[in-house]
Amino acid sequence: MAIQKKHGKGRLDKWYKLAKEKGYRARAAFKLIQLNKKYGFLEKSKVALDLCAAPGSWCQVCAETMPTNSIIIGVDLAPIKPIPKVITFQSDITTEKCRATIRSHLKTWKADVVLHDGAPNVGTAWVQDSYNQAELALHSLKLATEFLIEGGTFVTKVFRSKDYNSLLWVCNQLFAKVEATKPPSSRNVSAEIFVVCRGFKAPKRIDPKLLDPRSVFEDVAGPAPNNEAKVYNPEVKKRKREGYEEGDYTQFKEISASEFINTVDPIAILGQYNKLSFEQPKNGDVALAALDKLPETTEEIRLCCADLKVLGRKEFKLLLKWRLKVREIFGFPSKKTQKAAVDEEVAVVENMDEELRIQEELQRIKEKETSKKKRERRRENEKKQKEIVRMQMNMTAPMDIGVEQEGPRGEGAMFRLKTIDQNAALNKIAKGKMAVIKETEKPKDYDFGSDGETDESDEEADRLEEELDNLYDQYRERKAAADAKYRAKKARKENGDDEWEGVSGDEEKGSDDDDDEELEVDSSDDDSDSEDGESGKKLITDLDGQPEEKDGLSKRAKNFFSQGIFAEIPGLLEEPESEEEEAQEAELVEAVEDLKVTKKEKKEAKETKAKSKKAAEESDDDDDFEVVKNNEDDDWENVEKKKKNGRPDIDIITAEAMTLAHQLATGEKTSYDVIDDGYTKHAFKDRDGLPDWFLDDESKHDKPHKPITKAAAQAIKEKLRAYNARPIKKVAEAKARKKFKQAQRLEKLKKKADMLAGDDGMSEKEKAASISKLMASVAKKTRRAPIKVVKAAGSNKGLQGRPKGVKGRYKMVDPRMKKELRAMKRISKKK
């Protein structure tokens, strides 16, 4: 296996090798050396503070370059190995503990240079990484303002992003000179740049918002477009190529002329859109048709609306005047009519509407309830505060603490029946294993040979069977709550794909009964109907004894809606049905039954029509094309896709289906054989009266196993392998991008060729030569220049920078590298 050579971040990096040769802990040391060579700030400094210093290469450079007896402090989250003449400690630069440690080391000194070469953990979205880096640089700047001497230097690393300008603006407020540079040792593929800030102003007071990331990097909304300048001064307007608008990537914008008449801001439409259209939409527009037929809509107006971008100030004024005239004709309110209406409204006082009165009443009730809750909360807090004060003053024993005695629901919550009865607590108590079993007077006989009277009166067996069904239903509910596939299967069983043919009278009656069904453990089948109405009994009984009505309204809600303001609202309270409504309901049921009969007749007519049509097509062999009529009788809910020959498009995905299809195709089986195979001992099994748990378990084993062939299984495997062999999304997108770029190049080439072909100053020979030259330039593949190998010997030994006489890409080689490559090959062979 060939060894992959690494470029950029690999071992062959020049600065990496130089760092190893000179004993630096990281290649980043050369970045500081080159920055100091350009600006010269380390030689004059006596105190240096290195933030995010690990592994300590910048501290090494400071110790070598700065004068003797200088104070160098390095801090980082990661531990730093000891460095001579350098004080290092481990801390977070955003905490107060780090500031205190730095103060203890500096004492009364101030730092001449503050360095920051840190970066957060990257790997998420680029926007998040760049923001984290800018935020870290701002924190280091905040720390530098506390310890930097007046006229000092601050060097930090930042990423090129949208937050870069904001950070640079903050640096300009605090320093005299701010420059951004990129040293040669920084990789070209990296987005990092270094900002060197010199001449610290040392202000006496700094606004906290100036060093707050939330304020500095806050997104500022762009200025609103000046549409008035586009309309009233189109000649002076300067185009600013700022790209597309957010969410709108179309260059040509068109709007209906009727919308221009109806809008309240016509200048914005004239400044943003390209055309006012008079074309009718598909569904039709009455206002646009009337606008098109008005005599005020002259030919000049139509020409001006055709292209708004070429109009001048005069034409825009003409369109605005035309709009005012049309609005006056259509009866839209103008400025004069609005002023008159305002004067009249001042004089006339209208009565409050019924709807507004209801809304105000509801708002008042809501505010009253909110204030009541606030008062209760305040009293509870005051009570807790008093108890705490009593405890602190040793006025009570710990066992008498009121807060713990009362519990989370307050004092006496255990004996509040209203709280207990919430969320159908009574039904939960009476359900499941906690149900009360009624005592029987006489033991029951479970022998199968007993007489008929004892079998019919066997209430205990019925109760046990009902309890078993109840427990099985609870087990299924728990299983459904844990398994998503089970829930989906259950939903498919309940909601079939049958055709909906309306609601009959019997179904309407049964739907209400199904919603109210509940499992009663301590009741039999005979008295279950009588106890259905009593299942809603509560622990608290009203003294007035009025039963709750079926409309779902409580007594309090009913009293509220019985006020006079709700009397005139139709349909709010239930009214008894009249005889006419009952007759209409009976007619509706009859119509649904008739509809079912007519649908069956239509279906039979369709089959006969299809047979006759097929016979006619077979007889007519001279036609070259097939005429397919639109079948208006197709059901819109039939989502099954059909082919042109009328057969359903079925995807074969199992080996059993593939075996059956192969047998039908080869003639081993006919359709009648398949129908005969369906008549088995499992086809007409009597399932009435069997419990659900037995049917669910039996359904796993009562299905016949159909044989499959080896060829069918192999065909299904090949089909799945073809599905899996499809390219991934990234590969498909890359191919699509490549194809799109090729289409763009061909489009540009076509335009250039058309321009050359239409040039009258060139002969046909010159045109052909130019077009062939263009084609050759497109087909020509650009080859990268080969990398030149330069031996690090003689004059090139220990050379820093590009060797003399070498252009383009190159790499330095030496005997040491050759030995390392041989050793790597030898090690890889052993593995």
Swiss-Prot record:
Gene Ontology cellular component list: nucleolus; preribosome, large subunit precursor
Residues reported in the UniProt entry to bind S-adenosyl-L-methionine: 56, 58, 76, 92, 117
Enzyme Commission code(s) on record: 2.1.1.-
Pfam families: DUF3381, FtsJ, Spb1_C
Region (Disordered) location: 442-556, 569-644, 790-816
Record keywords, A-Z: Coiled coil, Methyltransferase, Nucleus, Ribosome biogenesis, rRNA processing, S-adenosyl-L-methionine, Transferase
Bias (Basic and acidic residues) ranges: 474-486, 534-554, 593-617
Superkingdom of source: Eukaryota
Catalytic residue list: 157
Principal localisation: nucleus
Subunit architecture: Component of the nucleolar and nucleoplasmic pre-60S ribosomal particle.
Protein task: Required for proper assembly of pre-ribosomal particles during the biogenesis of the 60S ribosomal subunit.
Protein name per its UniProtKB record: AdoMet-dependent rRNA methyltransferase spb1
Native organism: Neurospora crassa (strain ATCC 24698 / 74-OR23-1A / CBS 708.71 / DSM 1257 / FGSC 987)
